């Protein structure tokens, strides 16, 4: 299994499955930050130490099989082309920080559900991604990988402070739990302006689709815990579960109210966006995200028939700059990307509608 396996398809295997509450919660993620004992943190270590960490993981963990998960493949960042790294970021398999790391690496599971990032901000960052609202299952998988790694390496751990990490906000459990949520009705009714500060007061943080510093395009928000010290992993996940459940309820209520009070306006918005996606000859990524959000809402409310949310999940990744260029076989100028993006969207929508016997002659 090679790098090509991970960059050839827009959708990871786990993304093709429908999880609980998947019309609102797109994915659940658990990330565990760990460091090796007696090795300086990545912010301070030498090139030799960085390479030693990668070599250790290649010898002990690459090509190894884990029960119920499968084999892992090691990908070294310095051996990976910039375009391929960008695709891995767009698929959420690695972080933007890791992509920029000269001595970074990543152990990826065959189904792309689990990635173990090496020499990012910490020596080890275990990430588990599950479809829908499945934080408990993601935590269980992350702990399984954590135990597997700890059988063969010693972690930097303090009885007083817990797991030691480069960033003080990760000290303690080292856990970052997050959900990716599609909240168009709360955004359209401007309730997110009130909700975000309330979430922050609970010790949680709201970010965009690619985490810290990213914008919430396409009405997709990432909700995660902020502090990891003084709480157990279970308490942190329970807190996020509680807030997520409330957001699901509020989004459902807002969708219902919006459809009841502004049915024609909402249908117009949904079909107008479908019309743009079906007929555009050039389209930027931000407009694509906005239109995909509208169409997803239309599918979830039963306004649009003959399209599945899976095709939208695929288009979300497929129309990103990195994957577009990977799909096209090389680098593209911005206007060339906009033309290619429009062509791919039209092609995929026509294919999906035809497959479901709902051919739209305008596409």
UniProtKB/Swiss-Prot annotation:
Gene3D superfamilies, per the entry: Glutamine synthetase/guanido kinase, catalytic domain
Reaction(s) the record says it catalyses: L-arginyl-[protein] + ATP = N(omega)-phospho-L-arginyl-[protein] + ADP + H(+)
EC code(s) of this entry: 2.7.14.1
Matches recorded under Pfam families: ATP-gua_Ptrans
Keywords annotated in UniProt: Allosteric enzyme, ATP-binding, Kinase, Nucleotide-binding, Transferase
UniProt cross-references to HAMAP family, sorted A to Z: Prot_Arg_kinase
Family to which the UniProt record says this protein belongs: Belongs to the ATP:guanido phosphotransferase family.
Name this protein carries in UniProt: Protein-arginine kinase
Species assigned in the record: Bacillus pumilus (strain SAFR-032)
Protein encoded by which gene: mcsB
């Amino acid at each position: 299994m090679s790098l090509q396996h991970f960059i050839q398809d827009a959708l990871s295997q786990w993304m093709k499955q429908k999880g609980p509450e998947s019309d609102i919660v797109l994915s659940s993620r658990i990330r565990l930050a760990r460091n090796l004992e007696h090795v300086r943190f990545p912010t301070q270590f030498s090139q030799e130490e960085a390479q030693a960490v990668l070599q250790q993981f290649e010898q002990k963990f690459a090509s190894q099989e884990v029960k119920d998960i499968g084999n892992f493949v090691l990908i070294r960042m310095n051996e990976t082309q910039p375009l391929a790294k960008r695709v891995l970021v767009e698929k959420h398999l690695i972080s933007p920080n890791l992509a920029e790391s000269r001595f970074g690496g990543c152990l990826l599971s065959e189904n792309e559900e689990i990635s173990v990032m090496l020499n990012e901000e910490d020596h080890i960052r275990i990430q588990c991604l599950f479809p829908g609202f499945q934080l408990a299952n993601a935590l269980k998988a992350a702990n399984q990988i954590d135990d597997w790694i700890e059988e063969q390496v010693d972690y930097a751990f303090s009885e007083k402070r817990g797991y030691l990490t480069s960033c003080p906000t990760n000290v303690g459990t080292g856990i970052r739990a997050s959900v990716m949520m599609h909240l168009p009705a709360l955004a359209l009714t401007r309730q997110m302006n009130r909700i975000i500060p309330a979430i922050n007061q609970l010790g949680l943080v709201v970010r965009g689709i690619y985490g810290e510093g990213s914008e919430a395009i396409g009405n997709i928000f990432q909700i995660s815990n902020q502090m990891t010290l003084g709480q157990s992993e279970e308490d942190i996940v329970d807190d996020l579960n509680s807030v997520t459940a409330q957001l699901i309820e509020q989004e459902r209520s807002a969708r219902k109210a919006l459809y009841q009070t502004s049915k024609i306006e909402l249908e117009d918005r949904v079909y107008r966006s479908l019309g743009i996606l079906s007929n555009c000859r050039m389209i930027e990524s931000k407009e694509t995200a906005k239109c995909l959000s509208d169409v997803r809402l239309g599918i979830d409310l039963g306004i649009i028939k003959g399209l599945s949310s899976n095709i939208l999940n695929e288009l979300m990744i497929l129309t990103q700059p990195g994957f577009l260029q990977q799909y096209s076989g090389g680098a593209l100028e911005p206007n060339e990307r906009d033309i290619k993006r429009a062509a791919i969207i039209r092609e995929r929508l026509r294919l999906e509608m035809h497959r479901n016997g709902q051919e739209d002659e305008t596409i």
